[in-house]
Amino acid sequence: MSEASDASATGELRLEPVQFIARTDAVMRLGSMMLGAGGSSARVRDSMERAAHALGIDELHTRVGMTDIVATTSRGPLFRTRVTEVRRPAVDADRLTALKRLTNDLRPGMTTVELQRALDAIAARPRRYPELLRLLGAAFACGAFALLGNG
């Protein structure tokens, strides 16, 4: 007997709020992408709130750190707490702008699939500049800042 049919036989699928979990995961993915692109904690929190509202989540409580997000979502009697870590945060203004535009366009009734597709499209966009050029630009900016500070 397969795992899926085992779950059906015991009624486990009825107990597991699959759609609610998918909504929570989509909200967390948006927050993680924003934090990973250099978004401020206030901007990340605001964008996650907008997404949660658009997807039909009643309440969202978040704690956004420098490299992690802890969020608890609730809808009726259901709740779910998720933790995500951004391992390599960087500043990517282009991605941040695309994510902010997406959150500004969110409307109540949006589906999880629609949000995930929009996030997939943003994630698939190539970076505007190659890594070597970004590295050289950062080195130049740091050097210029040191000169301005009499360093």
Regions found by a protein language model. Give the residues of each.
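Soluble N-terminal domains of membrane-associated systems
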Residues: 1-110
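Short, well-structured alpha-helical segments that form the helix of a local strand-helix-strand
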Residues: 45-47, 116-119
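Short coil/turn segments at secondary-structure boundaries
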Residues: 115-116, 135
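Cytosolic juxtamembrane amphipathic/interface segments immediately preceding
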Residues: 118-127
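Core alpha-helical transmembrane segments of integral membrane proteins
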Residues: 128-151
